[in-house]
């Protein structure tokens, strides 16, 4: 399945509580993503009060990512298909 990096901008920052409420919210995002076959792998958050993040997703196509973004009320900016290249590639 193709892998994508998704840029998301949060003008007021992204604030996810580190407690049961945050876990419930993230669980809801995961469940909603599955309705379109999208798997959230992980996300890198910026150091500027979490105003931009870069999520890594497996999905059939960018449109599926946009659909679940809308369902989850999350902004979706640039979507780039990526592949992994690590330093052990040549060994």
Question: Model segments located where?
Answer:
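Short S/T/G/P-rich N-terminal loop/turn motif that feeds into the first structured element of a domain
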Residues: 1-35, 39-42, 46-50, 62-63, ...
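An amphipathic, aromatic/His-enriched active-site/gating alpha helix that lines ligand/cofactor pockets
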Residues: 58-85
